[in-house]
Amino acid sequence: MSSDEKGISPAHKTSTPTHRSASSSTSSQRESRQSIHVLERTASSSTEPSVSRQLLEPEPIPLSKEADSWEIIEGLKIGQTNVQKPDRHEGFMLKKRKWPLKGWHKRFFVLDNGMLKYSKAPLDIQKGKVHGSIDVGLSVMSIKKKARRIDLDTEEHIYHLKVKSQDWFDAWVSKLRHHRLYRQNEIVRSPRDASFHIFPATSTAESSPAANVSVVDGKMQPNSFPWQSPLPCSNSLPATCTTGQSKVAAWLQDSEEMDRCAEDLAHCQSNLVELSKLLQNLEILQRTQSAPNFTDMQANCVDISKKDKRVTRRWRTKSVSKDTKIQLQEGPPAKGQFNTTRRRQRLAAAVATTVPFSATMSPVRLHSSNPNLCADIEFQTPPSHLTDPLESSTDYTKLQEEFCLIAQKVHSLLKSAFNSIAIEKEKLKQVVSEQDHNKGHSTQMARLRQSLSQALNQNAELRSRLNRIHSESTICDHVVSVNIIPSPDEPGEQIHVSLPLSQQVANESRLSMSESVSEFFDAQEVLLSASSSENEASDDESYISDVSDNISEDNTSVADNISRQILNGELTGGAFRNGRRTCLPAPCPDTSNINLWNILRNNIGKDLSKVSMPVELNEPLNTLQHLCEEMEYSELLDKASETDDPYERMVLVAAFAVSGYCSTYFRAGSKPFNPVLGETYECIREDKGFRFFSEQVSHHPPISACHCESKNFVFWQDIRWKNKFWGKSMEILPVGTLNVTLPKYGDYYVWNKVTTCIHNILSGRRWIEHYGEVTLRNTKSSVCICKLTFVKVNYWNSNVNEVQGVVIDQEGKVVHRLFGKWHEGLYCGVAPSAKCIWRPGSLPTNYELYYGFTRFAVELNELDPVLKDLLPPTDARFRPDQRFLEEGNLEAAAAEKQRVEELQRSRRRYMEENNLEHIPKFFKKVIDANQREAWVSNDTYWELRKDPGFSKVDSPVLW
C-alpha cells in the first residue's frame, strides 16, 4: 500500500457520490461527535464502563479560537459535587430534521432536571405528546457561537439545534450547561443510575479505597472499608430484644463469609490499581511510537488543495480509534522473561522527554481533538532516538500479558466475593422470614383476642335487648290482624301484621347500628311484614339503609301512614301474598348478531323515537315504568318531610334528584319499550308508603306524565324525550320539570333533568353518561337554592360519573357542599369528614344476566293474579310483546311488537281522518307559572279504581 493510502479512511473510500452529497455535512459532523465522545471518555478497559469517564470530563478543549469553530462544553469535574438544582427552562428553538428530511423546523423545548423534551407546541407538552427526550447529562454538547448552533450527541442520534437571537442562544447555553452538570452529578450520586461506580476513579494511592484497608497481624480488617458499617456488639443490643433480633445479632457477629468477602474486595482493589497503572503504561507506549506534531499537521492541512481532496479515497492501514481495543494474548508469560519495574522507568523517561503531557491523557484520533485538522492527511511518524522498535514491541506484548493475568485475578476475586454475598443474603432472608413469621403470629393473636372481646360484649348487649323486647312483647297482647287479600280457596286465612312489635324492632335495630356505623343518613326502610322484598333479600341491607343519627327514636309517621292505608283498604292492590319476586323469568338475549349500522345509518341526527328497533334491543320495561323507578329512594323525601332545617331539606331533595340516575349505570346495553298512546302503569308500595300511576299523554311528541303521592310528599313530572343518534353515540334530551311538595312545611321544589348520552352504540362496550346542570328551587321560599353539576367526561379528566353541588343561601354564601358519583352515593361536607346522604342498595345475584336490573326494577313488571281484576286493561303489565320478552320468547315478542305498533298507526290514521284528538284519561294540560304547558293529575285514577273499578270503565284497545 502506498503512502498516500495510509491516511484515507474506509468510509471515504467506499461511499458513493450520491450518498455523500445527500449527507456529507451530517456524516462529517457525526464523525466529529464520535471523536468528541472518544475525547471525553478516556479509553478504559473492559472492566470499567465508559459512562463513568464521560461524566467526569476534563477541562474544555477549544477546537479553535475563532468564533466560527465548534467548542465542546465541559462536563462535571472530579470532586465537584455542590451543583444546585436548576430552574425549569422552556422556549422555542429550531431543530434540524433527520436525514433524509431537510430544513430547520420550529419546535418547543422544555428543559427540566437535565432532561430536554421537545414537541411542536406548548399544548402538546401539556398533553404528553412529546416528540423526543434527550438526557443532556449523558450527551456530548458542543456549540458554535457565530452560527448560534447547539449540537447534542446521544450516540444514537445527533440533535442539531439553532437559536435565532444571540440573547436566547446565551440563555440556552447557560441553562443547558447548568442542567448538564446537575444531571451528571445526580447520576454519579444515585446508585440506581450509576451502579457502575463501585470504586472511586482516582489515580493516587492515598485516595483509593485500598489505602483505607488496614492490616493487623497479617489479617484484613473489614471495618476499614468506607462503605462498610461497623458491626454491632452485644453490649449495644437492647435488653428486651426478641429471639429474632438475637439471631440477627449473632449472625452479624459470627459470620465469616463477610470477612472473607471484605478480604477479597481488598485484594481486588489492589489489583485494580495495578491494572490502572498498566493501562496507562500501555497507552503511553503506544503513543510514543505514533504521536505526530500538531503544528506540522495544521500546516500540511492548509496546503492540501481541493483537487487533492477529490482523489479517490483509499483505505487507511489501521484506524487509530481502534487503539483502545487492546488485543490480549492468551497464556501466562514465562518466568524471568522481563522486569516490570525497569520497563516502567524507561517508559516514563521517554514520555517525559518526547511526549506532551496532554497527549498522555487520552489515546484518541488526533484529528478528533481539532476539527480544523484534516482527517485524511498522511501522518509521518518522526524517528525516535530513545526507544528501539523491537524492544518497544516486546515490552508492549509483555505488558499485555501482565494486564491479562491481573484481570483474570480480579475476575476470580469478584466472583468469590459475589458468592460470599449470595450466601450471606440467603442467611439474612431466613432470619428475616422467621422474624416476620413470629411477628405476624403475635399480631394475629392480638387481633383475635380483640375480636373475641368485642363479640362477647356485643352478644351480651344483644341478649339484654332481646330479653327487653320479649318482655315488652308479652305485655302488648293486641295485634292488628287484617285480612289484606281474601283467598277464595281459604276464606278464613289472614295475614297478621304486628305493627307495634315490628316498629319496636326497627327502632332497636336503628339504635344498635347507629352506635357502630359512621354518620350518614341513607334511604329509610320500615320493617313491616314478610311481604317486603328488601327484608327478604337481605336483613343486613335493610338495617344499614335504615341507619341515621338524626332520625328520632319515636318517628313513626311512615308506619302510621301505612297502617292507616292497610286498615282502610286503600293499598290492598299492591300487597303480594308470597312476597315480591327477586329474579326475572329468563335472562336477557344475545344481541351480538344484530347489525345496528344497517338500522341506524340512515337516521343520523334524527329522532330515534320514530325508528322501529328489533325487540332484542329492548328490556322488559317501558318508559312509564322507568318514571316509577325514580321513586326507588323515596325515603329521602320522607326524611326531608321530618327535617326542620330548610338547608338540610334542600340537601335531601337534591340527593333524591341524584338517586334517580343510579339505576341506569348497568342499563346501557338495552332500551325501554316506547309506550303507546293511552298506555298506563300503576305501582303501590306498602313498604315505602306511596302509590304511583303514569300515562302516555302524547305520542308525537312523546310525552309521559306521572303522579306519586304519600302522606309526607307529592311528586309529579311530565317529560318530553328527544333522541339523537350521532353515529357512535346517542343523546337523550329530556324536556320538562320535576315537582315535589312537602305539605308539612309548605315547600314546593322544582328542578330539571340533565342530558343522557350512550356511547359506543355500534361497537365496543356501551356505557352511559349523564352531564349538565341541575338547579333546585323552592318556589315558596327564597331561603336557599341548590346547584348540581353532573361532570362530563373529557380527554383530560379521568373521573367519570362525578356530581358536584352547593347549597347557597340568599346572600350567595355556600352553606353545604355536595360531592359524589351518581352511581355510588352523595356526600355532604368536606372529605374526609363528609357525611353520606345517600347510597344505592346492593344489586341482585347475576344482575348482569338480567338486563342489569336492580331489585326494585325486577319487581316493577310483576303481575300478581289478584291484581288482574284491579288494574286497567291499558296497564303496561298486560302488554304482550313486553311480557314475551321477559319470558325469553323472542319470536313471539317480535311478532307482537310489530302488531302493537301497526295497531297504533291505524288508530292514528283513523283519528286524523275524522279530525279527532286524543284526550288523556287521568291527566290534564295546564299552564304553569313559567307559561309552559304541563300535565298534572285530574284526581280520577284512584277514584275510578275504587268505584266502580276499571273493569267497568271503557278503555281503548291498545294490543
Swiss-Prot record:
Belongs to the OSBP family. Residues 30-40 have a biased composition (Basic and acidic residues). Homodimer. Interacts with OSBPL3. It comes from Mus musculus. Disulfide bonds: none annotated. This is Oxysterol-binding protein-related protein 6. Expressed in skin, respiratory epithelium, small intestine epithelium, pancreas, striated muscle, brain, spinal ganglia, and nervous plexus of the intestine (at protein level). In the brain, specifically in the cerebellum, it is expressed in Purkinje and granule cells. Expressed in hepatocytes and macrophages. The modification N-acetylserine is found at S2. Pfam families: Oxysterol_BP (PF01237), PH_8 (PF15409). It is found in: Nucleus envelope; Cytoplasm, Cytosol; Endoplasmic reticulum membrane; Cell membrane. One of its GO terms (cellular component) is cytosol. It is a peripheral membrane protein. Regulates cellular transport and efflux of cholesterol. Plays a role in phosphatidylinositol-4-phophate (PI4P) turnover at the neuronal membrane. Binds via its PH domain PI4P, phosphatidylinositol-4,5-diphosphate, phosphatidylinositol-3,4,5-triphosphate, and phosphatidic acid. Weakly binds 25-hydroxycholesterol. SUPFAM superfamilies: Oxysterol-binding protein-like (SSF144000), PH domain-like (SSF50729). Residues 1-60 are annotated as: Disordered.
